[in-house]
Amino acid sequence: MKYFFILVLLFCINLQASQNDGEKLFKKYCWGCHHETSMAFGPSFNQIANQRDSGQIIAHIVNPKSNYQSLGYKRTAMPAFSQLNAKELQDLTNFILSFKDK
């Protein structure tokens, strides 16, 4: 039981660090069009988190033109962010998903 508690604690610390890194990426790449809980040019992270899973979010960040119709959009003005590596994509996605139900 003690080891389980330690593993849970380590997971929570890693998730928080990932979300912090994701917030930095949000401020660098996303803030001009998206806000955390209110509508801007693009949907809020709250709206995205409540309607998408992590795979859909990552696919849309990397290549929005590939799946915008399947996500219910008629068009997309979002540029591709294919320069982000796998860790950055996961960090940004963890940050976005932290707004679920907020």
Segments from the language model and where they lie:
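Axial heme c-ligation environment in periplasmic c-type cytochrome domains
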Residues: 41-49, 64-100
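Short sequence/structural segments immediately N-terminal
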Residues: 23-25, 71, 102
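Sequence/structural segment immediately N-terminal to covalent heme-attachment motifs in c-type
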Residues: 18-36
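Acidic/polar helix N-cap motif
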Residues: 13, 18, 85-88
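Gly/Gly-Pro-rich "capping" loops immediately C-terminal to redox-active cysteine motifs
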Residues: 23, 35-63
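Sec-dependent N-terminal signal peptides
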Residues: 4-13
